[in-house]
Amino acid sequence: MPYLLAAEADKIQEFIFRSSRLREVVGASQLLTRFCQSVEDTLAKRYNAQVVVNDGGSFRVIFDTGEQAVAFGADLAELYRLALGGSLTVAEPVELNGNFRKANDEAGHKLRWAKSRLQGVMAEPHMPYVAFCASCGVGLANTRGRLKGRRTAQRSQYLCETCQTKTAERDRKPRALL
């Protein structure tokens, strides 16, 4: 009997807009679309699966057996984590008794239930002795200082060399460039 598997990326907006402090956020949605298309070309073929939906971080895939669906879901979540650095929720497979609409509704319900449950701890790579700049969010901080003219001027913040140079320039206390 065929089975329908539903899976969906977690915190999709966070993934797409993670670089919002940069001047331009480019490439996240294209990267996600490319990942979804590559699943059909590689992983789905390995499991002899029929991909129904695979875009925007959402998947609906039909399998011959429930065991295939479960194994595919585990591999898909791991590949998503390795390729894009995020997590993917995979619902329990649903029997497909000839009525796709009913099975899809049930798969969607199981997916929402799975997303609402805490599924475990995701290890975040970290460097305990390194801080990112509080101003730009990109550079590695090398000092702790205050940014004048901000509401947070009373608090010290981690700052990178570039932001310190920009702050000094703005405050008309230019540093030697060379």
Regions of interest found by a model, annotated:
Residues M1-L178:
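Regulatory and interdomain segments flanking nucleotide-handling catalytic cores
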